[in-house]
Amino acid sequence: GSEMCIRDRRKEGISIPIIVMNPEFSSFNVLFENQLEPEVYSFRLLDAMIKETERRGITSYPIHIKIDTGMHRLGFQPEDVPEVCRRLKEQSGVVARSVFSHLVGSDSYIFDDFTKKQLDTFTRVAAELEAGLEYKVIKHILNSAGIERFTDYQMDMVRLGIGLYGVSASGQKGLRNISTLKTTILQIQNVPAGDSIGYSRMSYVKRD
């Protein structure tokens, strides 16, 4: 599974930092054994990480603080930052290497006002975190569409997702697709104009 894949990558000499998104408590052994850096999104997970580093006698283990600026899946709330700083400063087991958030609709112009609000919130919260911790952290929020459309917010790092496959989330033509989908035509039907095709009747035929 994924644990074997990670171990194999480390054995092959891949030594660069690897961030683990949405880690589970049951994965702590794999995290520490393979020097993986977890996303930390809640006080429960933060406290568990601190406790585990203390148990193992580890100091300054890198973690990545996730802030919820509008996706509402995982992440600390912006108002949690002072308490996050307090808990980090009163221990030595973990250290914040980066702070990040996730954009909801950076691929669509209709969400630009909301995206700008997310970007402004993150900029403010990241500065508050750095001020509270009294050291600099890596800041990143842009996904594939954000990289293309909000270049002023590339900060210290960006996260290229679907763009790795040459697919533009916002219709840009500068990326080269790395894969090709091929299939075989099994049947050709004559469908009268006005009839629907496929699930949920989402597509209608305009002509015979």
Regions found by a protein language model. Give the residues of each.
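Anionic-ligand-binding alpha/beta catalytic cores of soluble enzymes and soluble regulatory domains
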Residues: 112-207
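Active-site-proximal beta-alpha core segment in soluble small-molecule metabolic enzymes
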Residues: 1-138, 154
